[in-house]
């Protein structure tokens, strides 16, 4: 009998994002084995039990909690553990708190799954992905951040609402930091093959272009608005993570705005930022050096410098 290749995914962190990601992965049937690890072992056990009891409704999957030894030989390790921003805090305010957590997590993950792909979701994601890259010693392709995959989805949704079209027919990217210095790449935004400005003029009556100022701010503030109301975000980010995992496991060569290591692109070096990137079974295969406007390039460089400054001021050795 020919056995289908199995995929093992471990999730470090059984909080709102980690547990919801496990649920999304389970529903999509992307893994044959899912292991949930958390410092709170009772919480991890309860989440795994709750998910496992729905096994009759999904494709065959073994879901369990455990410790790092149970993550051995994972194909992908998703890191969601860490301290999230409280109301009034930004993602960058929590760097050193999460640095200490990652210094305890990453060596254990590397020990048991030296050939895995590491997918960082915890915030500030670009900085923590860089930290994971340094701590792991892995090739850059195998250390990926969730980047602005979620931000890009948020913008697609908002543009779809603005123009009253399906979000899947909106093509756009948020680039740079997953955070306050992120950039909306209007030069890469199109609907039905037309640049968004031309589409606006052609299709919409009284189009004044004000959405180009309003929507980027709404995207930036979306997470803070949700956190202020319910204390955390979990659903959309879990779907974003699941999309990245799907692209990896299915070797899709998909173009996603994951956080990848820059090595000279746009004059930027030695920092993780989000940019349209080819994602396949090897991980983040290639950052696409796509043409963007001069203003977008300048803002991308500024975003990189902000992140580099925070890394330099962190407690990373």
Swiss-Prot record:
Disulfide bonds: none annotated. Pfam families: Ldh_1_C, Ldh_1_N. This is L-lactate dehydrogenase. One of its GO terms (biological process) is lactate metabolic process. Pathway: Fermentation; pyruvate fermentation to lactate; (S)-lactate from pyruvate: step 1/1. It catalyses: (S)-lactate + NAD(+) = pyruvate + NADH + H(+). The modification Phosphotyrosine is found at residue 224. It is found in: Cytoplasm. The gene is ldh.
